[in-house]
């Protein structure tokens, strides 16, 4: 079953959008790769393309976008989005945070992220190494691909300063997976956080997007199941429906859905 959030309470609908903690989400990812043989690279590409699809659907007139990529898998999703955006006629600029372009894989970077970073370079997408004193230009939209669900502990001081800088822009901000600085399980702020206009999340809905600070910082929510088989949600159970129905912390949200049975995005209107 799926959930639309209306007047603060989840209403059951005919799509499956399970709600999970990060540890359960990671189990789903492991199943997708090990049992259903969908590679990490394929999942990264599916999610990056879905993020770009939603961006175009939600903001069809946007042309100049700035994508802030961390060195983890969330950054890899940002690199995929950049490539897709260029194919669709946009002008993407990538800001590399905590790393820089390299012809050899850095020790702490997953090979899939390095592959997508180099694919951007080969396609002529401008890659900038971020520094606090650099001019960020005048983007029409900002993409947050810094950490996703991979943030542990508090946001580092230099990242906190970047988030404050980005928050000063008056353009839409699209977060991939989870806004930077928000705990994907608890919805709490990890020191500092970037408030998104919209957040696109994948495979399952993360509880932290719907409760506490996360319900505000996530903005509108888009969900894409990455073509996951329905059986996977029986293998790893999410949050019990009863616990959601009894919760007073669930916030009325605008949520966009797309799964393998749909060609476009469907909006839950609260």
UniProtKB/Swiss-Prot annotation:
YjeF N-terminal domain: residues covered: 25-234
Keyword Lipid metabolism appears in the UniProt entry: no
GO MF terms held by the record: metal ion binding; NAD(P)HX epimerase activity; nucleotide binding
Alphabetical keyword list: Isomerase, Metal-binding, NAD, NADP, Nucleotide-binding, Potassium
Cofactor(s) listed in the protein's UniProt record: K(+)
EC number(s) given by UniProt: 5.1.99.6
SUPFAM superfamilies associated with the record: YjeF N-terminal domain-like
Comment on bound cofactor: Binds 1 potassium ion per subunit.
Chain residues that bind K(+): 74, 144, 180
Enzyme class per UniProt: isomerase
Any Pfam family the entry gives: YjeF_N
Catalytic reaction annotation: (6R)-NADHX = (6S)-NADHX; (6R)-NADPHX = (6S)-NADPHX
Amino-acid positions noted as binding (6S)-NADPHX in the UniProt annotation, renumbered to this chain: 73-77, 148-154, 177
Signal peptide boundaries: none
Function: Catalyzes the epimerization of the S- and R-forms of NAD(P)HX, a damaged form of NAD(P)H that is a result of enzymatic or heat-dependent hydration. This is a prerequisite for the S-specific NAD(P)H-hydrate dehydratase to allow the repair of both epimers of NAD(P)HX.
Family of the protein in this entry: Belongs to the NnrE/AIBP family.
Protein name listed in UniProt: NAD(P)H-hydrate epimerase
Species annotation: Legionella pneumophila (strain Corby)
Gene: nnrE
């Amino acid at each position: 079953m799926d959930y639309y959030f209306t007047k603060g309470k989840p209403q059951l609908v005919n799509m499956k959008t399970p709600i999970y903690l990060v540890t359960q989400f990671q189990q789903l990812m492991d199943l997708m790769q090990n049992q259903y043989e969908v590679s990490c690279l394929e999942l990264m590409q599916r999610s990056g393309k879905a993020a770009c699809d939603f961006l175009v659907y939600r903001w069809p007139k946007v042309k100049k976008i700035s994508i802030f990529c961390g060195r983890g898998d969330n950054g890899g999703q940002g690199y995929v989005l950049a490539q897709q955006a260029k194919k669709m006629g946009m002008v993407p600029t990538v800001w590399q945070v905590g790393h820089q372009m390299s012809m050899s894989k850095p020790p702490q970077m997953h090979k899939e992220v390095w592959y997508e970073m180099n694919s951007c370079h080969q396609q002529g997408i401008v890659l900038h190494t971020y520094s606090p004193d650099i001019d960020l230009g005048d983007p029409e939209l900002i993409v947050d691909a810094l950490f996703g669900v991979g943030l542990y502990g508090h946001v580092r001081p230099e990242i906190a300063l970047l988030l404050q800088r980005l928050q000063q822009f008056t353009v839409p901000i699209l977060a991939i997976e989870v806004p930077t600085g928000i705990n994907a399980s608890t919805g709490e702020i990890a020191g500092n956080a970037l408030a998104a206009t919209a957040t696109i999340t994948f495979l399952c809905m993360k509880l932290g997007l719907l409760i506490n600070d996360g319900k505000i910082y996530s903005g509108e929510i888009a969900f894409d199941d990455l073509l996951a088989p329905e059986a996977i949600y029986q293998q790893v159970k999410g949050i019990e429906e009863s616990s959601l129905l009894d919760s007073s912390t669930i916030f009325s949200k605008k949520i966009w859905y797309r799964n393998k049975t749909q060609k476009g995005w469907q909006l839950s209107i609260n």
